[in-house]
């Protein structure tokens, strides 16, 4: 169904069964598949392909040659009706690719809201990207990667499958991330190693001086105390009782499966 207030360019193809919301704009030479939902006010500039069981929220801007919901590159994929879900107010720039999930990975690739995906960024099958993240030009997420809120992945950086990138992390350009990156940390290099706390990012987001100091103290326990992670976990949990921002570390430890970058 195409809402009567939506615009569809005469050269675009919207297959029967697709849902196009109010005031959406489907530009020239776009292709929208039969199981696609496009939300209110979302704009497909031109030459955009949206395929598969894909749901896109409202007020997104999707630029030319982006491909969303296409068959993933997992060799086990056998055509199952897996999905892509994208939230609201994202800017998805030229030639970005977002692939549908796999049955083995839960069947869903999910992108939240208010993200900026720069030119040629790739989000593979079963990834989860939170809110207000930035993937710079040519940043690549392998399958099953999780990127938490406010994280930034630098240009041409690559993240290994199943890794977790914590909230407020900054991954430097051209880095190769092969293990989990705890929240608030700057990661740089190939293989990526920790380079301190993303202090400038935290200041910009309104973190208090006291909270930043507590986060730095937690970082020092993890990386500079000479103790094992199991040894410092109780100390970090105690610190989190006074500074709730530190609880992001304890929650992250419970999710981590690949070990932390070192």
From Swiss-Prot:
Main location: cytoplasm
Enzyme class, broadest EC rank: transferase
InterPro entries (alphabetical): Acetyltransf_C, Acetyltransf_C_sf, Hexapep, Hexapep_transf_CS, Lipid_A_LpxA, Trimer_LpxA-like_sf
Pfam family of the protein (one): Hexapep
Disulfide bonds: none
Enzyme Commission code(s) on record: 2.3.1.129
Gene3D superfamilies (UniProt xref): Hexapeptide repeat proteins, Udp N-acetylglucosamine O-acyltransferase, C-terminal domain
PROSITE patterns: HEXAPEP_TRANSFERASES
Keywords: Acyltransferase, Cytoplasm, Lipid A biosynthesis, Lipid biosynthesis, Lipid metabolism, Repeat, Transferase
UniProt GO molecular function: acyl-[acyl-carrier-protein]-UDP-N-acetylglucosamine O-acyltransferase activity
UniProt subcellular location: Cytoplasm
Pathway the protein takes part in: Glycolipid biosynthesis; lipid IV(A) biosynthesis; lipid IV(A) from (3R)-3-hydroxytetradecanoyl-[acyl-carrier-protein] and UDP-N-acetyl-alpha-D-glucosamine: step 1/6
One annotated GO biological process: lipid A biosynthetic process
Reactions mediated catalytically: a (3R)-hydroxyacyl-[ACP] + UDP-N-acetyl-alpha-D-glucosamine = a UDP-3-O-[(3R)-3-hydroxyacyl]-N-acetyl-alpha-D-glucosamine + holo-[ACP]
GO cellular component, one term: membrane
Subunit structure: Homotrimer.
Function: Involved in the biosynthesis of lipid A, a phosphorylated glycolipid that anchors the lipopolysaccharide to the outer membrane of the cell.
Family recorded in the similarity comment: Belongs to the transferase hexapeptide repeat family. LpxA subfamily.
Name of the protein in its database record: Acyl-[acyl-carrier-protein]--UDP-N-acetylglucosamine O-acyltransferase
Organism name: Escherichia coli O157:H7
């Amino acid at each position: 169904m195409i809402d009567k207030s939506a615009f569809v360019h005469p050269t675009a193809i919207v297959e029967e069964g697709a849902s196009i919301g109010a005031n959406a704009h489907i530009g020239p030479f776009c292709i929208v598949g039969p199981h696609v939902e496009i939300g209110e006010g979302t704009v497909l500039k031109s030459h955009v392909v949206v395929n598969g069981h894909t749901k896109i929220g409202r007020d997104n801007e999707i630029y030319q040659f982006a491909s969303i919901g296409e068959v993933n590159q997992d060799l086990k994929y056998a055509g199952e009706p897996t999905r892509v879900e994208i939230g609201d107010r994202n800017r998805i720039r030229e030639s970005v690719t977002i692939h549908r999930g796999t049955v083995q990975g839960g069947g869903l690739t999910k992108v939240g809201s208010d993200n900026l995906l720069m030119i040629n960024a790739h989000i593979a099958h079963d990834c989860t990207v939170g809110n207000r993240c930035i993937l710079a030009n040519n940043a690549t997420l392998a399958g099953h990667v999780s990127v938490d809120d406010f994280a930034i992945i630098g240009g041409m950086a690559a993240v290994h499958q199943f890794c977790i990138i914590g909230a407020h992390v900054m991954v430097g350009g051209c880095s190769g991330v092969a293990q989990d990156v705890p929240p608030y940390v700057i990661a740089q290099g190939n293989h990526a190693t920790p380079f301190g706390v993303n202090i400038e990012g935290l200041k910009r987001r309104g973190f208090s001086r006291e909270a930043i100091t507590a986060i730095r103290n937690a970082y020092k326990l993890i990386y500079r105390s000479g103790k094992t992670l199991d040894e410092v976990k109780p100390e970090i949990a105690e610190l989190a009782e006074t500074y709730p921002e530190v609880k992001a570390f304890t929650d992250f430890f419970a999710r981590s499966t690949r070990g932390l970058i070192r």
